[in-house]
Amino acid sequence: MKAAVIDIGSNSVRLMLWADGKVLFKTLKTTRLGEGTAFSPFLKAEAVERTANAVAEFALQAKTEGAEQVFAYATEAVRSARNGAVFLTCVKERSGIDVEVLSGETEAKLGLYGALGKSSDGGIIDVGGASTEVCFREKGELVFSVSIPLGAVRLFDLCRDDRALLQESITPYLNALNEAPKKLPVYGVGG
């Protein structure tokens, strides 16, 4: 069976088509859905339009390529936006697809499984556009997971080249990392 997943991030939308455990096709469009969310709790109308159009295009492409199922997931930009429901409605109207908004913890777990597979112990730091997820697994069990609402795009929009402001922005979240395991390998994920 062929299936597709559409990953709606704060900076880009990704499409991956697979069958029988093998990736057949991957592509990405930069839509900057989370543009401006460092200063406003609302998604910009232009960003909603760009991103909904990309999702509709990818849904059509997946179906044209023979995908029997198309799954779509959204992350921090939609999760934290006061008008996230407007975006979800727009996507549904244009593509016919219901988008699932992932919790920060689920996003972190999926990043961990994607980087480490089902059995390896270790952790990931997944820097997205609007959030950063940190997740660890030890002896097959999830032992730590946190989602921090600061990602590369959001921090750049907020701080630009101001290192003092950058430090001030991230310091409140550093204590959340104190409980993370210290002796496991850690892998960086992003993009």
What are these regions (language model features)?
Residues 1-2, 68-69, 120-122, 181-184:
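Short coil/turn segments at beta-strand junctions that form active-site/ligand-binding loops
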Residues 60-89, 185-191:
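Short beta-strand-loop/turn "lid" adjacent to the catalytic site in phosphate-handling enzymes
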Residues 51-65, 173-180:
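A short, N-terminal amphipathic alpha-helix
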Residues 11-46, 138-165:
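Short glycine-rich, Thr/Ser-proximal phosphate-binding strand/loop in the N-terminal lobe
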Residues 94-98:
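Short acidic, glycine/proline-enriched helix-loop-strand junctions
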Residues 157-190:
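ATP/pyrophosphate-binding catalytic subdomain of soluble kinases
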Residues 100-124:
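Conserved phosphate-binding catalytic cores of ATP/NTP-utilizing and phosphoryl-transfer enzymes
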Residues 1-24, 115-148, 191:
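Gly/Thr-rich phosphate-binding beta-strand-loop-beta motif of the actin/hexokinase/Hsp70
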